[in-house]
Regions:
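Conserved functional micro-motifs across diverse proteins
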Residues: 1-159
Length: 159
């Protein structure tokens, strides 16, 4: 099996592949980073944003997830290469969602999939949602997000 992180900067032709030694190896993600585990998933960190009313709109339908009052949202483009569907709120495959602020305050996150599931070989959005105090957005203190997908652990520097 081979695993790779593809980082793209600038024009499409400029890409760098960096192999991951093992499935449980850690990886740092940045906006636009694509990670592939050839047997179970491919994901790209699409965007990070703050919102008071988290929702996702497709066509005429708006999906809302109403926990707390202010959130940091991590949006992933996710391709399910596994034989089982990835379902909304499923914590068996995408799990251990943690957000650490200033190196000492930890917030747990939840997984949300607006289409209710991502069937095998299909792509969709997966949202990692963290309820946070409003002052985190404007702070300059470190903000690190960690999560795991099928045993691979990923870290995102949110600043």
């Amino acid at each position: 099996e081979s695993y790779a992180i593809v980082v793209q900067k600038g024009i499409k032709e400029e890409s760098v592949e960096q192999p991951i030694e093992a499935l449980d190896a850690s990886g740092d993600l940045a906006i636009g980073t694509e990670v592939t585990n050839n047997s179970t998933f491919r994901l790209t960190l699409n965007e990070l944003y703050y919102t008071a009313k988290p929702s996702y709109k497709t066509g005429n339908v708006t999906y809302s997830y109403g926990i707390g009052d202010y959130h940091l949202v991590c949006k992933l483009d996710y391709t399910n290469l596994d034989t089982q569907a990835l379902r909304t709120w499923d914590t068996s495959r995408i799990k251990d969602l943690k957000l650490t602020f200033a190196g000492e305050y930890t917030y747990d996150g939840v997984l949300w999939i607006p289409e209710s599931k991502i069937v095998p070989l299909a792509s969709g959005y997966a949202f990692l949602i963290f309820e946070v105090p409003r002052n985190i957005e404007d702070s300059t203190d470190p903000l690190m997000l960690t999560f795991s997908v099928d045993g691979s652990v990923f870290t995102v520097n949110c600043r």
